[in-house]
Amino acid sequence: MKISFQLSSVALRVLAFGLALILCAGLAGAEIRRFVTNVVASPGLPIDLTMLESAAAYFPNSAKVRARLASRMVESQLDGKQSHEALAETAFRHAAKAVELAPANYEYRVLLSAAAELKGDGATAESALREAARLAPNNVSVRWQMANLLLRTGKVEESLGEFRYVAEADPRRLPNALDLLWRATGGDLSVLERVLGADPKARLTYAEFLTEQNLFEAAAQAFARCDRANRLQSPLTGRVLDAFLKSGQWEWADRLWRDTMATDNQADNALLWNGSFEHAPRKGLTQFDWHLNDNNFAKLVIQAGGKSGQRALRLAYLGVDTTRLESEAQHLLYLKPGATYRLECFAKPERLVTDEGPKIAVVRADTREVLADSVPVSTAANAWQLLAVDFVVPAESPAVMVTIRQIPRYRFTEPTQGVIWFDDFTLKTQ
């Protein structure tokens, strides 16, 4: 449908033109006001408090400007021109006006809650935040603030449901939730366990938290409640085991690591795990498996070519003088304190040229003191040869390292060249 007018007189045309100008000016003014209020309300734009107050006075019906002013006051909590109480009251008034102007905006309800808490009105703070949660029930940030407010006001029981919701929706917040509840309840583990939810990996987060409190038995129990499949997949598993090791909890670390690695189709009850290099190391889970690192003197890799199995450790020298190997190949063991053990392995050199070949050594895990070592790998024949080490585990240090060790006797030695294969490491009690 088309509507048209015929303006025959000059007066009517002038009147119409004037009305159009007024309408355009009004629309332009509205757009200008919208632009200015959006700029003033932008949190990324640095505007001092005085200017915000002037803007709020000039645009009294702008919810955005009112909210920005209230937010600024809540954040600063300090104004040289007025007391804390007066500032809190003013912030509350502006936040309340923002809610009145835009009642469907949950963020303004959150702001009103903060302003109410700032002036000591806990009931209004809780009421406003509950309304925000009603408007945005799936907003994790709102639920997190609800949980914190309830905890601050002593409503621990009510806060647990909120903390649990947040932990399930955003697992990254679980460590903070555990810390807050730990402090609020004086370390009541029964309370902390109620926020873990159904995610098995939450048990690993909980276990890591407990290691930080030096509650290693409780941490081990929490760790064990997470099924093996999830443990093998989660990077948290390695962090928990590392925390046990860092605290010298060798026995717990060994027990939990073996329980994790001994899946239904892969069991290894030997004192020295993976002695024949048949199991592929898992990233982050090599605490009691082989640690291999190249250096400037040699490269180490597990590949096909084993003595009794499919694979072996290949050590290839780079032909650099004064060759030194200390921790490039090592394996952590937890053993019985004071007990005597015999370590054996096989080595096969290929075109090995050296002043003195490497040895198999057993060192303390804490001080790296050498407890015993084998004879050097012989260059006499390119065949598998047996290396053996007898040693006693220190009573005060049940954790030891098996290493491939080559220390030059002099400040300069001729380059070591060639390759050595290592395989079939075994450990037995004497």
Language-model features: locations:
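Residue at a conserved register position within TPR or TPR-like alpha-solenoid repeats
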Residues: M73, A116, L150, L180-L181, ...
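Short coil turns that delineate tetratricopeptide repeat
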Residues: A57-N61, P103, P137, E168-R172, ...
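TPR alpha-solenoid repeat register
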Residues: V65, Y108, V142, R173-A177, ...
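Extracellular and organelle-lumenal recognition/adhesion modules and their flexible linkers in secreted
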Residues: R13-R34, N38, R172, R194-Q430
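Canonical positions in the second alpha-helix
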Residues: S54-A55, K97-A98, E131-A132, V166, ...
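Short coil/turn linking the two alpha-helices of tandem helical-hairpin repeats
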Residues: G29-G44, A70-Q82, L118-D121, G154, ...
